[in-house]
Amino acid sequence: MRRNSLSEKIGACGAMLRDITPLTVSGRIVSVSGLVVDVAGLAGQAFVGDQLLLYGRDDASVRAEVVGFHDGLAQALPFGPLNGLGPGQTVSLLPRSAGTLAVSDGWLGRVVDPLGRAMDGRGPLPLGLLPRPIAAAPPEATHRARLGDRIALGVRALDLFTTCRLGQRLGLFSGSGVGKSTLFAMLARAAVCDVAVIALVGERGREVREFLEDDLGPEGLARSVVIVATSDTPPVLRRRAAYTAMTVAEHFRDQGRSVLFMMDSVTRFCLAAREIGLSAGEPPSTRGYPPSVFADLPRLLERAGPGKDKGPGATGFITALFTVLVEGDDTNEPVADAVRGILDGHVMLDRRIAESGRYPPVDVLRSLSRAAQGCLTAEERLLIRRARGIVALQTEMADLVRMGAYRPGSDPAVDEALTLGPRIESLLRQERTEQTSLDAAFQMLREALGPAGLPQ
């Protein structure tokens, strides 16, 4: 791990000094409507993204984020309940450092909230030397490294049919109740990486502890930082959880490490952004989503990937897996369509496959890794191509076979598909705790296809 140079530390201190608000800037609450608090007296002092401290009755206070301006008033969304807030109460502008995180290696093994505070009852988090803005820009495209070698995800269906590379971004698309969370847990436990950063955005509260103790386990947690914003938290915190998690991942990537970033789910991030946009007065457009939602998506997703090119062995990578909960199993709904256009590949989970009892229910014919060709050997490409062809032909002929309309021996290619297809299906079936290396997965596919699957 490289130590930060003295000049970098001095530069960071200078940035912190520039961001300090020299005097206490105060305003007052004008109105409270829905989720929005309108604040007067901050013109020229507060900007979008700044944080405020709202003082309610009985000396209680709650933080809020400025999300827009209207008629000279700052529109703020609180990080907590609105109870006790009313017109005339005092508002203070917090220093710009409130929008940064001082991440350190001591965060490994910890559970963190969207504001960078510990949630696991193990005391405060150790702070790093360099505060990072949570709304940082992605690395410049011309200075970014290229994708690295392939990474073992530990799930055969993905390692074979959507082979992933270091720095690649994959989306896991699924309807509700299809098995997305199960696959997410398998990947969190089995994927090979130096550090895992896991964002649970809008999850049910009861599922968080189950994930930490049953799915991740002590060994998995030791190499991970988990950022949690449950479904009952305000939308501004649910959205911030994703940015906080990405900021943590960037800290470890900039050290030259291989980081696995996992987020469940992008859909709930977009729903939170929709609540914020509509509350700020944005007009709804596609299916009720305001334009800002589709502007936020690339700003977040593009931050994952390779870091700056520092040469072999020194470049860090954020390999990202984003889950997308599609509405009504419609993979072309606005969020799914936008995410699929940004990412480097997609894994489609199919309800019919799940109902047949095969888990994980990955539809290998509809799943794709755009970067796989750059990390497969000629023999492996042939194996995958043949396996896809067999699965496609078996799927095409399934109805005719069930009806008894196909007579064995009529077509050698169909006969081969009907013979080898069940072997591939068996290969794709995997228990939650079962792990397979990349080499073992390809060897299992060779054995399933038999001699005909090998290059001539």
Please provide the spans of the model-predicted regions.
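Acidic-enriched and Gly/Ser
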Residues: 2-11, 18-22, 31-153
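P-loop NTPase nucleotide-binding/switch module
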Residues: 91, 99, 119-168, 181-186, ...
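P-loop NTPase catalytic core
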Residues: 160-161, 167-456
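Glycine/charge-rich, flexible interdomain linkers and switch-proximal surface loops
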Residues: 24, 106-107, 245, 317
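A broad, low-specificity signal for short, low-complexity segments enriched in glycine/proline
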Residues: 1, 12-15, 35-39, 130-135, ...
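Short, charged, intrinsically disordered terminal tails
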Residues: 1-14, 444-456
